[in-house]
């Protein structure tokens, strides 16, 4: 039984915002909250799908919805954009629909002719966005590979006033985001994910009205290579880890919570990565035969 005093409910909290008394419950059903946010996102994606007829415009609107979702809920240390990823040798990836990169340790971003270019060292994750997952797993994998093959650098940095050694390169998360799946069940997607090899392997994805998934891999520690010895060995170490991947399990969520199981899995992977390695700016400046002083 609710207990009230002067019209106020003892089971609720109250606060003033803009001189208005607002009421909210002391307890909230998290499942209802997740369902509400999921339905809101799905409704927006379905509006794009049903009412935007031009394929290019429909795709751009869908990409922007995913970007805005991740910008809203990821911590401020991460930035999210559509971009092309570059390395210090001038190589570039394919244009990625969603790139999650470091907001602090990204010393420069190029914008030219409507395209954004982000250094590979700053990238945490990349995703391909499609309306339907059908026929697009391999395509997404090839685009993810175009980022992972880039030549990343890593140098020492100052941490809490002390010089820290160059951090070993971290994995780059790769995945696919879609509004729907026209496959009957999840087995076809699982088979396609199992067929991916090496740098093309995907880590997770969200098929919004079907379920999210993550891929659990068995990986083999490379022999005879120390990931901390030098940057060349470090690159080879990461490559061999990817090449050793064997799918242990592809796990799908319930469709009712696909969006937030995907999001929380992504956050967990980002937490595991920590912070991206410090970029070697002088490696990029070699292109213009210049160099900066690294100390002060």
State what each model feature region is.
Residues 3, 7-12:
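Short hydrophobic alpha-helical segments enriched in small aliphatic residues
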Residues 11-26:
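Short, Lys/Arg-enriched N-terminal segments with co-localized hydrophobic residues
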Residues 24-95, 100-296:
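Intrinsically disordered, low-complexity Ser/Thr/Pro/Gly-rich regulatory segments
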